[in-house]
Amino acid sequence: MRQNLKKVAQIKVDESKKLFPYVFRVKTSCGNCAKRSKPKLIYLLIFSLISSCFVFAPQLLCFPYPSALFLIDSSIKEIENRVSESNIESPKTSQKEESISCDRTGYRSDICFMKGDIRTHSPSSSIFLYTSNDLTTDQVLQEKIKPYTRKWETSIMETIPELKLVTKDMKLFGDKRKCEVIHEVPAVLFSTGGYTGNLYHEFNDGLIPLYITSKRFNKKVVFVIAEYHKWWEMKYGDVLSQLSDYSLIDFNKDKRTHCFKEAIVGLRIHGELTVDPSQMQDDGTTINEFRNVLDRAYRPRINRLDRLEEQRFHARLAQRRKAKRPKLALFSRTGSRGITNEDLMVKMAQRIGFDIEVLRPDRTTELAKIYRVLNSSKVMVGVHGAAMTHFLFMKPGSIFIQIIPLGTDWAAETYYGEPAKKLGLDYNGYKILPRESSLYEKYDKDDPILKDPNSITKKGWQFTKGIYLNDQKVRLDLHRFKKLLIDAYAKSIR
């Protein structure tokens, strides 16, 4: 049946000189001509019908569609689709391509590469590679991996479920799982567990490593996510759409057998909020290219917001453009590490000549709106914390001032200062003096907590967190901080 339909479909694309021999051809020597005569009569009738439609269509309207061939073509495609769905086979691969290899040399993460007949089985937290190679043992070959990028941090890695990558010899194991969904592009599987929920970790442990790992596929890749969160997809959907043309797969919830020719399990990570061009496989991609991804992701939404604002506040916007005052974006904190004299600092910055926009984002704040503010700002100011990750939204050449509380020097410089410089920002770290810390009122001036914070932080993370992160506020020496703002203003109006 399918062969006959393909012959009919050929009528549509063949030239007329090829059509007639095809329809009227009769074999002179045929031992079974009686059985063939009926199909050839059908061809003749169909051809006559099509020919009459081409000639008399304007008058007789043989079909309600632009062409009679539309119906034939649609029918053929429908039947062929049904046939392909009922006979699903995995993508064919050669023996040389069948392999599992893992790189466990990285300090921050493990990563495994699979090629061949790959099939997922989420109920057993497994991904199978069925091979036609003769294995040297009748035992199943297996790798285990936790696809999260904080390998060295034992406490958090204990919360990440382990995946099994299993090689099976098709000749020895008869439980080859039938493909329910076939993918023609590779998979990248990773976890959004761990510290997901903290902005810094969402970028550092997730999005940037995902970009590093998947970039070479040029969006022709499927993301398979362990510990999937719907809110995470909603929050970063605009960015993910710039990295993949395909829908996400919830590995734990989607019980179907997904089949791939290639898969990467785990992510590459180069460092804190950065892309190391020397480790990229292409032309030396940097963190600036990742920022370009963010710009493409948020640009459509920003353009819509700009149009809406212009319609509502046309006069005010015109006045602001005329003034041409540089914008300073201030990230405001409440609770620990908050600036107790923030209002006075804002007024001082306004007197210097800045337009001030105070940002108080929470988990529900739309990232495109924050990106819009920072992308149009000359200066970003904030106290050390996860919100400083937003420096990625600043244009290269912009000024980033990070206020560094006592005991946070190393973290502030490592997590935000150095990465900001790599992005091309003019980074300035403002290290507060003991008298600018609320701890000054709690401890004697000669106490190591004030006099030698390094001796305290060396005792471990719990001391750093308990004293310097959770129990400290900042009261800026405005005269001292003013010098930094004046310098930033001078640079921003050049």
UniProtKB/Swiss-Prot annotation:
<keyword id="KW-0333">Golgi apparatus</keyword>
<keyword id="KW-0808">Transferase</keyword>
<keyword id="KW-0328">Glycosyltransferase</keyword>
<keyword id="KW-0472">Membrane</keyword>
<dbReference type="InterPro" id="IPR007657">
    <property type="entry name" value="Glycosyltransferase_61"/>
</dbReference>
<dbReference type="Pfam" id="PF04577">
    <property type="entry name" value="Glyco_transf_61"/>
</dbReference>
<keyword id="KW-0735">Signal-anchor</keyword>
<keyword id="KW-0812">Transmembrane</keyword>
<feature type="glycosylation site" description="N-linked (GlcNAc...) asparagine">
    <location>
        <position position="375"/>
    </location>
</feature>
<feature type="transmembrane region" description="Helical; Signal-anchor for type II membrane protein">
    <location>
        <begin position="41"/>
        <end position="61"/>
    </location>
</feature>
<dbReference type="GO" id="GO:0071555">
    <property type="term" value="P:cell wall organization"/>
</dbReference>
<comment type="function">
    <text>Glycosyletransferase required for the proper composition and structural properties of released seed coat mucilage. Required for the production of highly branched xylan polymers in seed coat mucilage. Facilitates the addition of xylose residues directly to the xylan backbone. Xylan with xylose side chains seems to be necessary for pectin attachment to the seed surface. Essential for xylan synthesis in seed coat epidermal (SCE) cells.</text>
</comment>
<dbReference type="GO" id="GO:0048354">
    <property type="term" value="P:mucilage biosynthetic process involved in seed coat development"/>
</dbReference>
<keyword id="KW-1133">Transmembrane helix</keyword>
<feature type="topological domain" description="Lumenal">
    <location>
        <begin position="62"/>
        <end position="494"/>
    </location>
</feature>
<dbReference type="GO" id="GO:0010192">
    <property type="term" value="P:mucilage biosynthetic process"/>
</dbReference>
<dbReference type="InterPro" id="IPR049625">
    <property type="entry name" value="Glyco_transf_61_cat"/>
</dbReference>
<keyword id="KW-0961">Cell wall biogenesis/degradation</keyword>
<dbReference type="GO" id="GO:0005794">
    <property type="term" value="C:Golgi apparatus"/>
</dbReference>
<dbReference type="GO" id="GO:0000139">
    <property type="term" value="C:Golgi membrane"/>
</dbReference>
<feature type="topological domain" description="Cytoplasmic">
    <location>
        <begin position="1"/>
        <end position="40"/>
    </location>
</feature>
<dbReference type="GO" id="GO:0047517">
    <property type="term" value="F:1,4-beta-D-xylan synthase activity"/>
</dbReference>
<keyword id="KW-0325">Glycoprotein</keyword>
<protein>
    <recommendedName>
        <fullName>Xylan glycosyltransferase MUCI21</fullName>
        <ecNumber>2.4.-.-</ecNumber>
    </recommendedName>
</protein>
<comment type="similarity">
    <text>Belongs to the glycosyltransferase 61 family.</text>
</comment>
